[in-house]
């Protein structure tokens, strides 16, 4: 008893002389306590999970199988167990890749469940039909992957066709808008031309030309014929000669010729 007291006293004096070592020992003790608490908490959590699983298991419907049928059951093959292990590890990596709290504890629980399941699979026996199904899991998975890849390629081709159709539709929409703009410009030009024609001809609602009114001075002014006749001394003789000339056969022939010429010009 005195030896233990001397040893503890010696350790106390060493820690007193070396405070850094004392601090390191305290950190080691704290880390050990933390590890013990974590392990204890994990064990309690696993017990809770196990009890919860048993509670759920009691609610499941149990199926009785004849002993003679169990004789044909076979243990899982190593390839099937390796495949299950690979699949579970892939799921674990996917879960742990996310940013989640208490990742170490979750990883510990998941690894524990994985190892427990793999241990059960080593001694597990299944019917031959189930064995074939588990053996064909890899083949079925490859078939589903190939089908998914084919679907993705089909969707990619469909997306390319949709993009082309959208591009063609946008081009046609642009052409239609351009034609609408041209039609609008032409319509405005036609309206301007119609207004210009109306202004030139000055057509009123009755269809009669709206000519400017003549002044009273213009109406009262002598005609050009009267002015010319006023310059001729012998007006009656001149009018008589013009009447004879107008009624002569040569003048009539000339008038007929001119009329025929106008008719031919109009016909052509």
UniProtKB/Swiss-Prot annotation:
Region annotation (Disordered) ranges: 1-31
A Gene Ontology cellular-component term: chromosome, centromeric region
Modified-residue entries (Phosphoserine), positions: 31, 249
InterPro entries, alphabetized: CAD_CENP-Q
Domain of life the protein comes from: Eukaryota
Keyword annotations from UniProtKB, A to Z: Centromere, Chromosome, Coiled coil, Nucleus, Phosphoprotein
Subcellular location field: Nucleus; Chromosome, Centromere
Coiled-coil ranges per UniProt: 170-203
UniProt KW Transmembrane helix keyword: no
Pfam families in UniProt: CENP-Q (PF13094)
One GO term (biological process): metaphase chromosome alignment
Location, primary (coarse class): nucleus
Its biological purpose: Component of the CENPA-CAD (nucleosome distal) complex, a complex recruited to centromeres which is involved in assembly of kinetochore proteins, mitotic progression and chromosome segregation. May be involved in incorporation of newly synthesized CENPA into centromeres via its interaction with the CENPA-NAC complex. Plays an important role in chromosome congression and in the recruitment of CENP-O complex (which comprises CENPO, CENPP, CENPQ and CENPU), CENPE and PLK1 to the kinetochores.
Protein family per UniProt: Belongs to the CENP-Q/OKP1 family.
Subunit description: Component of the CENPA-CAD complex, composed of CENPI, CENPK, CENPL, CENPO, CENPP, CENPQ, CENPR and CENPS. The CENPA-CAD complex interacts with the CENPA-NAC complex, at least composed of CENPA, CENPC, CENPH, CENPM, CENPN, CENPT and CENPU.
Name listed for the protein in its UniProt record: Centromere protein Q
Source organism phylogeny: Eukaryota, Metazoa, Chordata, Craniata, Vertebrata
């Amino acid at each position: 008893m005195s030896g233990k007291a001397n040893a503890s006293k010696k350790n106390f004096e060493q820690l007193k002389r070396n405070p850094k070592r004392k601090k390191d020992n305290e950190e080691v003790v704290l880390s050990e306590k933390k590890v013990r608490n974590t392990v204890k908490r994990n064990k309690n959590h696993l017990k809770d999970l196990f009890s919860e699983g048993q509670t759920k298991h009691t609610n499941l419907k149990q199926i009785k199988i004849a002993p003679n049928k169990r004789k044909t059951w076979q243990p899982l093959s190593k390839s099937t167990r390796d495949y299950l292990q690979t699949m579970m590890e892939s799921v674990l990596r996917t879960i742990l890749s996310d940013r989640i709290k208490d990742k170490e504890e979750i990883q510990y629980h998941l690894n524990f469940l994985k190892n427990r399941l793999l241990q059960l699979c080593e001694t597990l026996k299944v019917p031959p039909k189930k064995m074939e199904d588990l053996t064909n899991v890899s083949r079925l998975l490859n078939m589903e992957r190939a089908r998914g890849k084919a679907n993705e390629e089909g969707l990619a081709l469909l997306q390319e066709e949709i993009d082309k159709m959208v591009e063609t539709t946008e081009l046609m929409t642009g052409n239609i808008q351009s034609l609408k703009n041209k039609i609008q410009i032409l319509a405005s030009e036609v309206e301007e031309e119609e207004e210009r024609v109306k202004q030139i001809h000055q057509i009123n609602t009755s269809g009669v030309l709206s000519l400017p009114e003549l002044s009273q001075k213009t109406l009262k002014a002598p005609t050009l014929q009267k002015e010319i006749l006023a310059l001729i001394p012998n007006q009656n003789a001149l009018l008589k000669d013009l009447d004879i000339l107008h009624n002569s056969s040569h003048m009539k022939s000339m008038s007929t010729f001119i009329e025929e010429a106008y008719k031919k010009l109009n016909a052509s």
